[in-house]
């Protein structure tokens, strides 16, 4: 009898091995849903982004007007725009939860998968930043000015680099056009990296909440986890659509309703909420170069996590001390996010500095110490 086409066809075989007959641990929890949710976020963002790009004009004199035109005159343009803007927020919620799950359950020991994942995060952050500039509102313009200007802190080449990025002596048309090109290109880079991420993941197979090998207890992905993922899609897309319909500007900045004006600086320049933790770390160091290095370190520190793993157990499931430290880190990140949205004045300055210090101390110092202590207590 002829074998199933999905098992023999060169292309369908790849799909089959990734989504249908994939052997999956039988005990992975809802925390493992965020990978597929990120995939749905990416597809949603590419589709809505493509529809927006058809009506957008990458020119300083027309960008703001073209976005307004989209919301007023294009069929469901307002909905597409708000799905795209809020979709970015959901993308970051999912990626932060996905990283948190990887950190908690020791998934970072699949080093290639983890490192590609960190590169994916950096690419996503770059994409979101350049996308935020495109509507050419006040916060778009000044956000672009402030963040690109950070490159001037690089010794010797900094100022030249900034002028090259700007295409002149300030953020203007030669800055906007390349940023639009980048914003169009980067999601496809993310899609390519996602395939690499999955390729490395399928080399080792998924981790599980116990952090032990699950080769003896695997079940096929279809139908068990495909239906579970479907539930995840519904639970994510429902609040996204509700937000786009009922509170589309809840996470946006009111300054962006004003067209960009180089002569008027907004009272508080701040990025979107998903960058606030890094922005707070940047602001907590009074020196410009030091701040830029701390900003970079706040994300690049993720590359070090596999090297700092000294515990004999993979997962934190049975390590209460590490669990306490993990949730302290989560609370610290929430404090940083809140501080980043506040003006630079007392007491927010000192709170931000203490929270930034705590962030690096927990990851680089306390986790290894506590891991060694747990090894000792358990005689491992």
Curated annotation (Swiss-Prot):
Domain of life: Eukaryota
Subunit structure: The cytochrome bc1 complex contains 11 subunits: 3 respiratory subunits (MT-CYB, CYC1 and UQCRFS1), 2 core proteins (UQCRC1 and UQCRC2) and 6 low-molecular weight proteins (UQCRH/QCR6, UQCRB/QCR7, UQCRQ/QCR8, UQCR10/QCR9, UQCR11/QCR10 and a cleavage product of UQCRFS1). This cytochrome bc1 complex then forms a dimer.
Listed PROSITE patterns: CYTB_CTER, CYTB_NTER
Keyword rRNA-binding on entry: no
Cofactor (UniProt): heme b
Residue numbers binding heme b b566: 98, 197
Annotated organism of origin: Aphelocoma coerulescens (Florida scrub-jay)
Pfam short name (any one): Cytochrom_B_C
Binding site for heme b b562: 84, 183
Membrane-spanning parts: 34-54, 78-99, 114-134, 179-199, 227-247, 289-309, 321-341, 348-368
Membrane topology according to the record: Multi-pass membrane protein
Family that this chain belongs to: Belongs to the cytochrome b family.
Protein name (database record): Cytochrome b
PANTHER family hit by this protein: CYTOCHROME B
Key words of the record: Electron transport, Heme, Iron, Membrane, Metal-binding, Mitochondrion, Mitochondrion inner membrane, Respiratory chain, Transmembrane, Transmembrane helix, Transport, Ubiquinone
Described purpose of this protein according to its UniProt entry: Component of the ubiquinol-cytochrome c reductase complex (complex III or cytochrome b-c1 complex) that is part of the mitochondrial respiratory chain. The b-c1 complex mediates electron transfer from ubiquinol to cytochrome c. Contributes to the generation of a proton gradient across the mitochondrial membrane that is then used for ATP synthesis.
Binding-site residues for a ubiquinone, renumbered to this chain: 202
GO BP terms in the entry: mitochondrial electron transport, ubiquinol to cytochrome c
Cofactor note: Binds 2 heme b groups non-covalently.
GO cellular component: mitochondrial inner membrane; respiratory chain complex III
Primary subcellular site in the record, as a coarse category: mitochondrion
Presence of the UniProt keyword Iron in the record: yes
Extra remark: Heme 1 (or BL or b562) is low-potential and absorbs at about 562 nm, and heme 2 (or BH or b566) is high-potential and absorbs at about 566 nm.
Gene it is expressed from: MT-CYB
């Amino acid at each position: 009898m002829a074998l199933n086409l999905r098992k023999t066809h060169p292309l369908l075989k790849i799909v089959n091995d990734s989504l249908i007959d994939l052997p999956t641990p039988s005990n992975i929890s809802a925390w493992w849903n965020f990978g597929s949710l990120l995939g749905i976020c990416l597809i949603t963002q590419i589709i809505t982004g493509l529809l927006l790009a058809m009506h957008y004009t990458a020119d300083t004199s027309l960008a703001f007007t073209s976005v307004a035109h989209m919301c007023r005159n294009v069929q469901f343009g307002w909905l597409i725009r708000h799905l795209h803007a809020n979709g970015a927020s959901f993308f970051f919620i999912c990626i932060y939860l996905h990283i948190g799950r990887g950190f908690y359950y020791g998934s970072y020991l699949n080093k290639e998968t983890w490192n590609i994942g960190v590169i994916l995060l950096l690419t996503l952050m770059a994409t979101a930043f350049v996308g935020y500039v495109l509507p050419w509102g006040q916060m778009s313009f000044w956000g672009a000015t402030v963040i690109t200007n950070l490159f001037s802190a690089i010794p010797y080449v900094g100022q030249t680099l900034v002028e090259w990025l700007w295409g002149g002596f300030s953020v203007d048309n030669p800055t906007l056009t390349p940023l639009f090109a980048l914003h169009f290109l980067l999601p496809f880079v993310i899609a390519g990296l996602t395939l690499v991420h999955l390729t490395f993941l399928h080399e080792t197979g998924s981790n599980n909440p116990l952090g032990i090998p699950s080769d003896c207890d695997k079940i096929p992905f279809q139908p068990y986890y495909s239906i579970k993922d479907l539930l995840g899609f519904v639970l994510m897309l429902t609040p996204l659509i509700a937000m786009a319909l009922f509170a589309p500007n809840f996470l946006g900045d009111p300054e962006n309703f004003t067209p960009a004006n180089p002569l008027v600086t907004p009272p508080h320049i701040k990025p979107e909420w998903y960058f606030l933790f890094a922005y707070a770390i940047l602001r907590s160091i009074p020196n410009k170069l030091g701040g830029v290095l701390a900003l970079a370190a706040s994300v690049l520190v993720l590359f070090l996590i596999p090297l700092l793993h000294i515990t004999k157990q993979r997962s934190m499931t049975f390590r209460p001390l590490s669990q306490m430290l993990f949730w302290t880190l989560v609370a610290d990140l929430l404090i940083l996010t809140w501080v980043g949205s506040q003006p630079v004045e007392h007491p927010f300055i000192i709170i931000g500095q203490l929270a930034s210090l705590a962030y690096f101390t927990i990851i680089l110092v306390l986790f290894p110490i506590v891991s060694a202590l747990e090894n000792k207590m358990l005689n491992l």
